[in-house]
Amino acid sequence: MSQHTSQYVFNSKEDYNVILDNMSREFEERWNHQTQSPYTNLENYITRAVLGNGSFGTVMLVREKSGKNYYAAKMMSKEDLVRLKQVAHVHNEKHVLNAARFPFLIYLVDSTKCFDYLYLILPLVNGGELFSYHRRVRKFNEKHARFYAAQVALALEYMHKMHLMYRDLKPENILLDQRGYIKITDFGFTKRVDGRTSTLCGTPEYLAPEIVQLRPYNKSVDWWAFGILVYEFVAGRSPFAIHNRDVILMYSKICICDYKMPSYFTSQLRSLVESLMQVDTSKRLGNSNDGSSDVKSHPWFQGVDWFGILNQEVTAPYQPTISGAEDLSNFENFEFKDRYKSRINRHPELFANF
C-alpha cells in the first residue's frame, strides 16, 4: 500500500495472521517516519462547505487547487487545544492517522498549519455518520448489525495488532462511505501501549468499569465498548443510558453491569453481548492472546465472509444516496464561522512537531 491510500487486496488463501504481521511492519515504518507540517495554511485547497463542528475543531469540505479531488479538512484552533489540554491528543491523532492503513480506518492524506490553526487533510467520506443513519431507522436487524460489527471487529483487531488502544468507539465516530462500508475516525484518544494504562478518557456511556474505577486497563476496554455498540445497534439505545443524564448513576450501573437485555435478541446475540460486557476482565471475550479470533469465531458471527468483508465484496444492506462530491445531504447544515488571523505564531514550541 502507498502512503496515501488504504487500498489493499486481501488474498483468502493467505494466513490472515501473516498478513497482519506484514501490515504491522509497514505500520512500524510509517510510525517511525513522521514529518513536520508546513506553514502553508490551506493555500493548496479551496474551502467549499462545513461538514461538522466538534468540541476540538471544525471539519470542512475542501477541493485541491491543482486537481479535482475532494477531501475533509479538520481545522483545530491552537488556542482551544491549549486551553482544553488537548495538545498531546492532537499530536497523537496525527501520528496514528499517518501510520495506520486499513480498509475501515480513516488515514492522513496531508497536514498543514498556520499561526492560529492546525489542519489534518483526510479522505472525504460523504455518506454521513453511522449515528445519524441509526437514529433515523432507530434499530438494525441482526443481519444489518452484523455487517457493521464485523468491520468494527476487524478494525479493532488491526489496531490492537499495532499496539493501539482506540478508546473512543461509538456510532458518532463511524462514517459511511458511498458503498455503505464504514470508516472509523477521530483518533484523539488512541494510545500506543504494549500493556496497561490508566488515563480516564472516552465517552461515559461506553466506558468499561475499570476505566470508571480509575484502575489500570488494557485493550479489552475496546471489546467492552464493542459489546455496547452491538447492543445499541439492535436495541436502538445504549444499555446504560440514563434519561436524566445522571453520570454518577450511569457509572454505578456500569460498574455492576446493571442493564436489561431485550427479549427479541437471539440467543447468539445475547451470548455475544454478555461475553463482551464482563466486569471481570479475565472472563471478557477478546481479552486473551488470541482475543480477536475469539470474538470473530463467536456463534453470532457464524457465516460471515471475513475476506469478503475485508475486500468489500459483500453487498452493504444500505448504501447512502450521494449525487457527487459536493452532495452534503448526509450531513447537518453548518455555517462558516469567521477565522481569526494573528500576526504572531501561536504556541510555536508546542506545535513544532505537528
From Swiss-Prot:
Active-site positions on this chain: D168 (proton acceptor)
> What Pfam families does its record include?
Pkinase
Its Enzyme Commission number(s) read 2.7.11.1
Q: What reaction does this enzyme carry out catalytically?
A: L-seryl-[protein] + ATP = O-phospho-L-seryl-[protein] + ADP + H(+); L-threonyl-[protein] + ATP = O-phospho-L-threonyl-[protein] + ADP + H(+)
- InterPro entries under this entry? AGC-kinase_C, Kinase-like_dom_sf, Prot_kinase_dom, Protein_kinase_ATP_BS, Ser/Thr_kinase_AS
Q: Name one GO biological process term.
A: signal transduction
Molecular-function GO terms, alphabetical: ATP binding; cAMP-dependent protein kinase activity; protein kinase A regulatory subunit binding; protein serine kinase activity; protein serine/threonine kinase activity
Domain spans labelled AGC-kinase C-terminal: 302-354
Cellular component per GO, a single term? nucleus
Q: Which SMART domains match?
A: S_TK_X (SM00133), S_TKc (SM00220)
Give the source's domain of life in one word. Eukaryota
Looking at the record, the residues that make up the Protein kinase domain are 45-301
Tell me which residues bind ATP.
Answer: L51, G52, N53, G54, S55, F56, G57, T58, V59, K74
Keyword Nucleotide-binding assigned: yes
Keyword terms = ATP-binding, Kinase, Nucleotide-binding, Serine/threonine-protein kinase, Transferase
- Please tell me in which tissues this protein is expressed: More abundant in adult body than adult head.
> Which family is annotated?
Belongs to the protein kinase superfamily. AGC Ser/Thr protein kinase family. cAMP subfamily.
> What is the protein name for this chain?
cAMP-dependent protein kinase catalytic subunit 2
Species of provenance: Drosophila melanogaster (Fruit fly)
User: What gene name is listed for this protein?
Assistant: Pka-C2
